[in-house]
Amino acid sequence: MKRFIPILPWLGALLLIAVALLSFETDLLWRVQLYNLFLDTPLFFRELMVEPGGLLSYVGCYFTQFFYHPWLGVLMLCGWWLLLMWLTKRAFRIADNWTVLALIPVAILLVADMSLCYWHYYMKLRGYFFVPTIGTTAGVAMLWAFRA
């Protein structure tokens, strides 16, 4: 039982975030997917690959389409954030009694996504809602692999 105790603050925080997003930001989440079109064609993939960070945008667009049903998109986002917290704990070797520190990157990503306000309509970066989360997760995973 003691082995699963450190994950409880993470799950509690993610549940609180999910309830808040689904209660107050459902319309915003639906509009995010509306303005981020994902096509599963080779042309769309090649078009994104010529841009810097194209694979990141492609994966971000893929996950953004799940906001068509906001609960499903929030579930995907919270899943990425849970993975990020786990990787943060492993990469920085955070002790079990300090596992709350792994919430800091998630809090920063949440603020970054929610503070865009009207800029959601002007953003030219495709998949921008998931791009910082996936990029941070990839960076922390590479750091963990380097330190292992």
Model region roles, listed by residue range:
Residues 78-95, 137-146:
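Transmembrane-helix motifs of polytopic, lipid-linked glycan transferases
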Residues 38, 49-53, 97, 101-148:
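Membrane-interface micro-motifs in multi-pass membrane enzymes
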Residues 19-72, 76:
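Membrane-interface coil-to-helix junctions
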Residues 72, 76-89, 99-105, 124:
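Core alpha-helical transmembrane segments of integral membrane proteins
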Residues 1-17:
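Start-transfer (signal-anchor) and selected internal transmembrane alpha helices
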Residues 1-5, 65, 69, 73, ...:
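Juxtamembrane/transmembrane-helix boundary motifs in multi-pass membrane proteins
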